[in-house]
Amino acid sequence: MYEYIKGKYIGINKDYIIVDNNGVGYKIFTSGNTMANMPKPEEDVLIYLTQIVRQDFIGLYGFLTKDELEMFNKLLTINGVGAKASLSLLSICTVNNLKYAIITGDEKTIVKAPGIGKKTAQRIILELKDKFKSTDISKGNSEINNLDVDYDEHSKKLEEVRFALNSLGYSEKETDRAINNVDKSEGIENIIKSCLRFLMN
């Protein structure tokens, strides 16, 4: 039903973002990767969408890139892999890294995602391996490994920032909002200082 939405980025919550389009705020569930790359609030953004309709739930899921949306949809075709598990995978892996893990049969990377056990990881590899080629990965193996290291270090850095802010009494929602509004390329100490300045304003 939906292809994409273009509007003003309003903010982030635990597992979704809010985009305003013509005065209507759209709640869009998304991955950690997309959340980490969102612009600053009030800036325009384009999110590629898919809608999931169940008997007890209707929700929008969206991503900054078509590649991530396509990977999300492919994961949903696998028995036992729902939207939550798919988002979990796309939060601990970039699309390139996940494709590489599937092509090479790397279960260890896939089971790092919360909600993904060994059998599910094996099923993902079995059912999707033939759908990807090495040429689908836009970076070489050495760069893939560098991406892994960079992403792991980035995630670890943000976790330390979250822990520090939570220890100071800030809620998860306040912490996520602050992190989303500061420069995350700086060192941990500077990110914490920037977050505190944001929260105190």
Swiss-Prot record:
Q: Which UniProt keywords apply?
A: Cytoplasm, DNA damage, DNA recombination, DNA repair, DNA-binding
Pfam families found in the cross-reference section: HHH_5, RuvA_C, RuvA_N
Keyword presence, DNA damage: yes
Q: What segment(s) does the record annotate as region Domain I?
A: 1-64
According to the record, the residues making up region (Domain II) are 65-143
Q: Name one GO cellular component term.
A: cytoplasm
Write out the ranges of the annotated region (Domain III).
154-201
- Any one GO BP annotation for this protein: DNA recombination
Repeat as a keyword?
no
Any one GO molecular-function label of the UniProt entry: ATP binding
Q: Which CDD domains match?
A: UBA_RuvA_C (cd14332)
Where is the protein localized?
Answer: Cytoplasm
Region Flexible linker: what ranges? 144-154
- Matching HAMAP family: DNA_HJ_migration_RuvA
Q: Which family does it belong to?
A: Belongs to the RuvA family.
Q: How does it assemble?
A: Homotetramer. Forms an RuvA(8)-RuvB(12)-Holliday junction (HJ) complex. HJ DNA is sandwiched between 2 RuvA tetramers; dsDNA enters through RuvA and exits via RuvB. An RuvB hexamer assembles on each DNA strand where it exits the tetramer. Each RuvB hexamer is contacted by two RuvA subunits (via domain III) on 2 adjacent RuvB subunits; this complex drives branch migration. In the full resolvosome a probable DNA-RuvA(4)-RuvB(12)-RuvC(2) complex forms which resolves the HJ.
Summary of the function given for this chain in its UniProt record: The RuvA-RuvB-RuvC complex processes Holliday junction (HJ) DNA during genetic recombination and DNA repair, while the RuvA-RuvB complex plays an important role in the rescue of blocked DNA replication forks via replication fork reversal (RFR). RuvA specifically binds to HJ cruciform DNA, conferring on it an open structure. The RuvB hexamer acts as an ATP-dependent pump, pulling dsDNA into and through the RuvAB complex. HJ branch migration allows RuvC to scan DNA until it finds its consensus sequence, where it cleaves and resolves the cruciform DNA.
What protein name does the entry list?
Answer: Holliday junction branch migration complex subunit RuvA
